[in-house]
A protein has these predicted regions:
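Short alpha-helical
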Residues: 22, 50-51, 163-164
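Short, solvent-exposed loop/turn segments at secondary-structure boundaries
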Residues: 20-23, 90
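Non-catalytic pre-domain segments flanking phosphatase-related domains
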Residues: 1-10, 32, 36
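Asp-based phosphoryl-transfer active-site loop
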Residues: 4-21, 43, 99
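Solvent-exposed alpha-helices and their adjacent loops that cap or buttress functional pockets
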Residues: 1, 61-62, 148-150
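Conserved acidic, metal-coordinating active-site core of Asp-based
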Residues: 102-175
Length: 175
């Protein structure tokens, strides 16, 4: 057979998981069987790896079958069996003030991740709360986002009402 599958890359939300963000028993069993037959599984997502993807990787036993996690929209690739970070592409720290300015002048919240925390100046923001819930993370309020983010980061996210995005885009491209 010329079409032997060796690698299966799966997005999480709406692909691997159902609307409740769960892996069904049928899907889990099918993917474990595929791994037993030599198929490598990669879970790919914009989510952070620790809380956002790890529980799903563990359900699928990626550590036992040498699977991988591709987190932060490709910003980090981890061999889930060894824990080795195989690839890491961090956000250029010089772009952070620009992103922060775009977010604040458009009244959007900006977030990043630090271990089990979502860091933000706006812990009560509806979209920040959704991001934390999706990734099973706690929210840590910071007084000043730029002062708080002194560590290298793989991703930051600007969140807000989708209908306001066109005005956000105009403001940021004119900066």
């Amino acid at each position: 057979n010329l079409w032997i599958i060796k690698l299966l890359v799966l997005d999480l939300d709406g692909t691997l998981t159902n609307p409740k963000k769960e892996i069904t028993e049928h899907t889990k069993n099918t993917l474990i069987k595929a791994q037993q037959q030599g198929v490598k599984i990669v879970l790919a997502s914009g989510r952070p790896d620790l809380n956002g993807i790890a529980p799903l990787a563990n359900q699928l036993q990626l550590d036992e079958y040498e699977g991988y996690i591709l987190s932060y929209n490709g910003g980090e690739i981890i061999d889930w069996k060894t824990g080795e970070i195989m690839y890491k592409n961090l956000l250029d720290p010089e772009v952070l003030p620009y992103l922060y300015e775009c977010a604040t002048k458009s009244q959007f919240a900006i977030v990043t991740y630090d271990g089990e925390y979502v860091l933000t100046e706006y812990p009560e923001d509806e979209y920040v709360l959704k991001e934390a819930l999706l990734n099973v993370m706690k929210i840590k309020k910071v007084d000043n986002f730029l002062d708080a983010v002194k560590h290298p980061i793989a991703k930051c996210l600007i969140v807000g009402e989708p209908t306001a995005w066109p005005s956000w885009k105009r403001r940021c491209t004119s900066t």
